[in-house]
């Protein structure tokens, strides 16, 4: 299993690792700060530097069948099993997604608290987030974005910690995605925005809501009866 450094610290930009296995263009390391994507969030990109000092681009990161994290590399350099590497993530890309990710938790929490609305689908890229909600009224989503921006200004420190599954399941509304079953893993990573939201979540987040900046509504689409899709980004 690959040690996932981002689970404890989303702000690791560079790390040292060792090549455990190579499968074609994919490299498995003993540890990584690259997020493999998941939960609607895009994967990280960046590069590895081998022992010769060659810079090798990482163009895709994904989770393998055995829980290992696979780093897809280009052919501008060579790697060998047991070779030490230095990994660097594309921080600008990652940090924008962190801001959008935390913003999406605030929006989802407000939707659930005010209207009992659940997310029925979503995706976060560096450019924007899109979420599907089971709500009837477009104005509801505009209201949520405005209220989320007021919460962001409150300068709230996030808490990230780990709980046994049985203990985590006792937290009300720990899963806010419609149709999503609680994960079967024994230890859950909990992301809490005190007074606002608490969720089981495996992705990178900012430390403080003020880092989000401002949520900017891009558009709202009808996606069938009682379902709306909202697109938004963050600035600056």
Curated annotation (Swiss-Prot):
Which terms does the UniProt entry file under GO BP?
A: alanyl-tRNA aminoacylation
Residues annotated as binding Zn(2+)? 101, 105, 205
Principal subcellular localization: cytoplasm
Q: Which cofactor does it need?
A: Zn(2+)
Tell me which UniProt keywords the record has, alphabetically.
Cytoplasm, Metal-binding, Zinc
SMART domains given for it? tRNA_SAD
Report the InterPro entries cross-referenced here.
Ala-tRNA-synth_IIc_core, Ala-tRNA-synth_IIc_N, Alanyl-tRNA_Edit-Domain, Alanyl-tRNA_Editing_Enzymes, Thr/Ala-tRNA-synth_IIc_edit, Transl_B-barrel_sf, tRNA_SAD
For this UniProt entry, the molecular function terms from Gene Ontology, in alphabetical order, are: alanine-tRNA ligase activity; aminoacyl-tRNA deacylase activity; ATP binding; metal ion binding; nucleic acid binding
- Report the coiled-coil segments: none
Q: What Gene3D superfamilies would the database entry show? A: 2.40.30.130, Threonyl-trna Synthetase, Chain A, domain 2
Gene Ontology annotations for the cellular component aspect, listed alphabetically: cytoplasm
- Where, per UniProt, does this protein localize? Cytoplasm
Q: Which Pfam families match?
A: tRNA-synt_2c, tRNA_SAD
Cofactor remark from the record: Binds 1 zinc ion per subunit.
Q: What is this protein for, i.e. what is its function?
A: Functions in trans to edit the amino acid moiety from incorrectly charged Ser-tRNA(Ala).
User: Which family is annotated?
Assistant: Belongs to the class-II aminoacyl-tRNA synthetase family. Editing domain AlaX-M subfamily.
Q: Which NCBIfam families match?
A: a_tRNA_ed_AlaXM
**Protein name as annotated:** Alanyl-tRNA editing protein AlaX-M
State the organism named in the record. Answer: Saccharolobus solfataricus (strain ATCC 35092 / DSM 1617 / JCM 11322 / P2) (Sulfolobus solfataricus)
Its taxonomic path starts at:
Archaea, Thermoproteota, Thermoprotei, Sulfolobales, Sulfolobaceae
Protein's gene:
alaXM
């Amino acid at each position: 299993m690959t040690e996932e450094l981002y689970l404890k610290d989303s702000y690791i930009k560079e790390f040292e690792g060792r090549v455990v296995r190579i499968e074609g263009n994919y490299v498995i390391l003993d540890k990584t700060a690259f997020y493999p994507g998941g939960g609607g969030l895009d994967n990280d990109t960046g590069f590895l530097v081998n022992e010769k000092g060659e810079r090798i681009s990482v163009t895709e990161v994904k989770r393998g069948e055995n829980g290992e994290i696979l780093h897809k590399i280009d052919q501008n350099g060579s790697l060998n099993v047991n070779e030490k590497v230095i990994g660097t993530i594309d921080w600008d890309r990652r940090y924008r997604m962190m801001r959008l990710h935390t913003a999406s938790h605030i929006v989802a929490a407000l939707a659930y608290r005010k209207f009992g609305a659940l997310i029925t689908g979503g995706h976060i890229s560096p450019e924007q987030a899109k979420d599907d909600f089971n709500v009837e009224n477009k104005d509801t989503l505009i209201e949520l974005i405005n209220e989320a921006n007021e919460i962001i200004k409150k300068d709230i420190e996030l808490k990230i910690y780990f709980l046994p599954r049985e203990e985590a399941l006792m937290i009300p509304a720990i899963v806010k995605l419609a149709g999503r079953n609680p994960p079967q893993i024994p230890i859950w990573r909990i992301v809490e925005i005190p007074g606002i939201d608490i969720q089981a979540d495996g992705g990178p987040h900012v430390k403080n809501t003020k880092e989000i900046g401002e949520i900017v509504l891009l558009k709202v689409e009808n996606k069938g009866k009682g379902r709306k899709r909202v697109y938004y980004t963050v600035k600056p």
